[in-house]
Amino acid sequence: MKKDSRKTQRRHKQGCAVIDSSLKLDSRVAVIRLDLSYQDGKGSADRLNSDLNKLRLNARSKSSIFKDQIGYVIKLEKGNNDNYHVHALFLFRGHEVKNHKYKAEQIGRYWQEIITKGDGLYHNCNTKEYDKNCLGAIERNDEDATNALKKNVAGYLCKDKQSIKNSNGSDKKIREFRCSVIKK
């Protein structure tokens, strides 16, 4: 197996730090995982970057959805057929967010209906098919769940594959990997 690149190692360390920081802020964390994308032909690297910036900026003012968020890790990717998409991990105060599947649906619908004005798609990973990835409520003292979250989810989000390049060839930087600021 190929050794992870320094970039992947750095990203993984940052992602794990966000998880650790969130668990220090609240003894129970609601872990939400979404894949965000576009309908065929509706997305580009630049649009994805712009829409993701809107999502992050709007999160500050959209308290009905993001009020109890304490962290996030986001990876932008380009898949087959120029399919631009995002893998996102959102961390919320678990004592406030009781229904993680519903919270994932709220964020997904917000992406689809408001941010992308109907052009967006989302996949709610907080379903039974992803149970092994420790999504949903995680207790601070549950080391097995925390380690599985770091290995399976943060590890997946931090991978090097499917790198994004600007669609118009500009030098404008598109940040492929984004994390919340570690709160102390």
PLM feature segments, named:
Residues 39-41, 91-96:
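A short, flexible beta-alpha/helix-coil linker loop
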Residues 51, 89-91, 103-105:
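General N-terminal targeting signals
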Residues 9, 63-67, 86:
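Amphipathic, alpha-helical segments enriched in basic
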Residues 72-94:
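Histidine-centered divalent-metal-coordination microenvironment in nucleic-acid enzymes
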Residues 1-26, 94, 98-184:
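Catalytic "initiation/cleavage/transfer" segments centered on a nucleophilic residue
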Residues 42-43, 82-84, 97-99:
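Short catalytic/ligand-binding loop motif for oxyanion handling, primarily in non-cytosolic enzymes
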Residues 18-78:
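Signature for HUH/AEP ssDNA processing cores
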